[in-house]
Amino acid sequence: MLVLRSAALFVVAALFEIGGAWLVWQGVREQRGWLWAAGGVLALGAYGFVATFQPDAHFGRILAAYGGIFVTGSILWGVVADGYRPDRWDIAGALVCLAGMALIMWAPRNGG
């Protein structure tokens, strides 16, 4: 159950962080307006709170593991939101990142 909770929190964090960054990008770079950018700033702020709900108490471990989700989520966001087409190296790299995330978060440990 803790693995499912942790994975769900990583997905929520990715939606806030990647979505927030995308909104800032759209607002500034694509000139959609400052309301888009402001929405992005709010989403990025919300992202900062999500990690505090992770069951593991080690900040460094949580953020390091989240990196794998961020990489994979960013590629997926690009596919859905921008029509990006990842190549085999993008996919292989994302899979390596996910394997690293799983190892960091859920490898058996003796007391910590």
UniProtKB/Swiss-Prot annotation:
Keywords: Cell membrane, Membrane, Transmembrane, Transmembrane helix
InterPro entries per the UniProt record, alphabetical: UPF0060 (IPR003844)
Pfam assignment, any one: UPF0060
Domain of life the protein comes from: Bacteria
Bilayer-spanning residue ranges: 8-28, 33-53, 62-82, 88-108
Subcellular location field: Cell membrane
GO cellular component: plasma membrane
Membrane topology of this protein: Multi-pass membrane protein
Family: Belongs to the UPF0060 family.
PANTHER family found in the cross-reference section: UPF0060 MEMBRANE PROTEIN YNFA
Name of the protein: UPF0060 membrane protein SCO3297
Lineage, opening ranks: Bacteria, Bacillati, Actinomycetota, Actinomycetes, Kitasatosporales
